Amino acid sequence: LTTHAAFDSHPVWSPDSKKIAFQSNREGSLDIFVIDAKGGAPTRLTTNSGSETPIAFADNDHVLYSASLQPTAQSIIFGDNTFPQVYKVSTKGGRPELFSTLTMENISIAKNGDILYHDKKGYEDPWRKHQKSPIARDIWLKSNGKFAKQTTFTGEDRSPVWTSDEKSFFYLSEQDGTFNIYRRSLNSSSDK
C-alpha cells in the first residue's frame, strides 16, 4: 500500500476494514498517517516533533495512539518517554485530544466501547522470559469509566483480544512456564 522510501510501520486496521493507520517518518519525525485500505495517498494526522505510534481505532473515524507529549503537570504521571500517554485524533486530522494519562498497551476495543489492554507499571525488557515481579504486565478492562483488573498472575499477562461474542478474551500468559494463549471470561478468575 505504501511505496515511499520512508520507514512505515505499526499498521492498525479500522473496525470496518476500510482504513489503515500507520506510523511513518516521511515528514521527519514519526507521525501517524491513515490510508484507504485499497490504496491511495496517505493523510498525515499528527505533526508533533516527537514520536507517535498508532495502537487502535477508537471507532471508524478516530485513531488512538501513544506519545510522550506531557501536556500539563497535573495530567502527567512520569516525566519521561517510558510511560507514554494515549491520544485520540480524527481520521480527517485536527487537534488531538488526551484520551488517557495511563500507559495502555495492546488495546482491544469492543463494539460497545469497552477496552481491554495490558498495563505498564515499570520498565522491563518485553522479550525477557519467566519474569515474575510486581511490574509484570496485567490485563485490565475499562468499561463505563471504571477499571477492573482481569488477571492476577505474578508473571506476564498481555496482548488481550476480544472473542467474537465479546463476553471473553484471549491473551498471552506465562503462567504455565512459557507464553501460551489463554481464554478468560470477563471478571473471572479462571482460564480455559
Where on the chain are the PLM-derived regions?
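A flexible loop/linker signature enriched in serine peptidases of the S9 family
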Residues: 2-8, 23-33, 46-53, 61-87, ...
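Short coil/turn segments that connect the beta-strands within blades of beta-propeller domains
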Residues: 16-18, 60-62, 112-114, 165-167
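A structural motif corresponding to the C-terminal end of an alpha-helix
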Residues: 142-144
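Solvent-exposed beta-strand/loop surfaces of large extracellular or lumenal domains
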Residues: 190-192
